[in-house]
Amino acid sequence: MTAADRPLRAALLGVIAVALVLLGGGAAVALGIGRDEAPGADSVDVGFARDMSRHHLQAVEMANLVPERSTDPEIRQLAFDIAETQQNQVGRMQGWLSLWGVAPSGGATMAWMSGPAAGGHAGHDASAADGAPMPGMATDEELAALRGLSGTEFDVEFLRLMIRHHQGGAEMAQYGAEHAQEAAVRNLADSMAQTQAAETTTMTRMLTARGGTPLPAP
């Protein structure tokens, strides 16, 4: 495990703990799951929940850097919204995984995706290692550089990384919306796709206003 993975693991463990408390209270209905037959470990539903949880947790990690490094009210509000929304969604996805009786992580990264949407990026095929980088995710070096910035420089780089991060998650969300067997999973994935598309438009406007240019799309 790299140093950059530790905050993600800690956040994930916290989310799983909350999910288990919910499940102890009979939260299948609250989680939106009503099927008797749980999705299998190699299903789109499980793969989506696992990979999108990890993808989301990096966005939460980046958003949590904002309060100490930015004084821009618009950036701070954006980061708060991203952190709250995506942490909540991770809780739902981890709750599903617990309910289905599968591990919260595992399997080849993005092996649950197939076809053109999956083939365009390294790490989408079935041979990709568990924990391999997903499209749009920041590298350890990029995160380290972001932590060293403040003020407008931080704001610009935060927007650049978050725009690319959202773009990378869009294909996963769209694929989940179209191919998951559980209606609750399809609905959440569709909501993610729409919300992140709108946020990407907003962040691109904010970046331009601050004199920045987007990173190449993943």
Region locations from a protein language model:
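All-alpha RGS (Regulator of G-protein Signaling) helical domain and cognate RGS-like helical scaffolds
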Residues: 2-218
